[in-house]
């Protein structure tokens, strides 16, 4: 499908150089997600052979279809994306990241002009006005439970995260894997040394302090098992009638889906549809 899509290079409002570059490279993004949920692919040793074999299949498939279409083969195909949206839909660990906690509240922000926002409010999904934009953004909260024996954010060190990233950078990705590393206070010196030693390949990596601090309406908020049960009892919904969306969706309004990105104490509403 991606190879077919790479033929769509008629950019009406961009310079010819962009069209030429796109036709020359035809970059694809065949990504893996749920990596930390997999018993083999989450390991730094056992996964290498499998990753190289899967990468070869992706490359050969693109080559075969490109030859059939009479277009150049893509110069880069495989990657690891953050996968925030897909992972939520299929209940998988996000990209190459561990799951947040055994039990947590996941908040999602919606533009009040978005029909989906109004639909969820009407269906009784727990919601409250966004603290920063109370007149235009609504925050929905969902109680989440990780699977048994899931790898959690607190189970692995920063260096273990980086070493797994390196395996994927060398044995799977033609692009660079995207990852955000949670770093405990006592780990920063070791992390700095690792980056220095791997400077030639270290890109696509972000670092955030590993913190148990939870602020109001944070995207992920740790809760205990009892709180999870209470949330489900009071606000849990399993009988949402999605056919009613047609009553709200009268026009194309795809720019309304938004999620809050928070780093260094600053939060920004990000348009999910732009990615």
Positions of PLM-derived features:
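Short acidic, low-complexity intrinsically disordered linear motifs used
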Residues: 253-275
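Internal maturation/activation junctions in enzymes
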Residues: 9-14, 34-82
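Short beta-strand-initiation
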Residues: 72-75, 176, 262
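Conserved short loop/turn motifs at secondary-structure junctions
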Residues: 19-24, 42, 46-54, 181-185
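Solvent-exposed loop and beta-edge segments used for protein-protein assembly and interaction
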Residues: 29, 173-175, 261
């Amino acid at each position: 499908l991606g190879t077919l899509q790479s033929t769509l290079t008629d950019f009406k409002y961009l310079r010819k150089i962009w069209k030429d570059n796109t036709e020359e490279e035809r970059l694809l993004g065949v990504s893996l997600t749920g990596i930390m949920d997999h018993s083999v692919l989450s390991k730094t040793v056992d996964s290498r052979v499998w990753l190289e074999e899967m990468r070869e299949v992706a490359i050969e498939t693109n080559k075969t279809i490109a030859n059939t279409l009479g277009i150049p083969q893509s110069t880069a195909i495989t990657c690891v994306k953050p996968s925030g949206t897909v992972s939520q839909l299929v209940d998988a660990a996000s990209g190459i990241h561990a799951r947040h906690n055994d039990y947590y509240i996941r908040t999602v922000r919606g533009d009040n002009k978005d029909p989906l926002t109004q639909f969820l409010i009407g269906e009784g999904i727990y919601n409250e006005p966004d603290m920063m934009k109370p007149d235009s953004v609504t925050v929905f909260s969902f109680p989440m439970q990780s699977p048994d024996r899931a790898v959690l954010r607190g189970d692995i060190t920063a260096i273990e995260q980086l070493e797994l990233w390196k395996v994927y950078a060398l044995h799977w990705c033609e692009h660079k894997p995207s990852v955000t590393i949670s770093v405990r206070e006592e780990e920063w010196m070791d992390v700095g040394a690792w980056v220095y030693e791997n400077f030639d390949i270290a890109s696509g990596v972000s670092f955030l302090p590993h913190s148990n601090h939870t602020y109001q309406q944070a995207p992920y908020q740790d809760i205990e098992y009892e709180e999870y049960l209470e949330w489900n009892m009071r606000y849990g919904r399993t009988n949402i009638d999605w056919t009613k969306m047609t009553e709200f969706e009268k026009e194309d309004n795809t720019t309304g889906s938004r999620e809050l990105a928070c780093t260094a104490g600053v939060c920004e509403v990000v348009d999910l549809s732009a990615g």
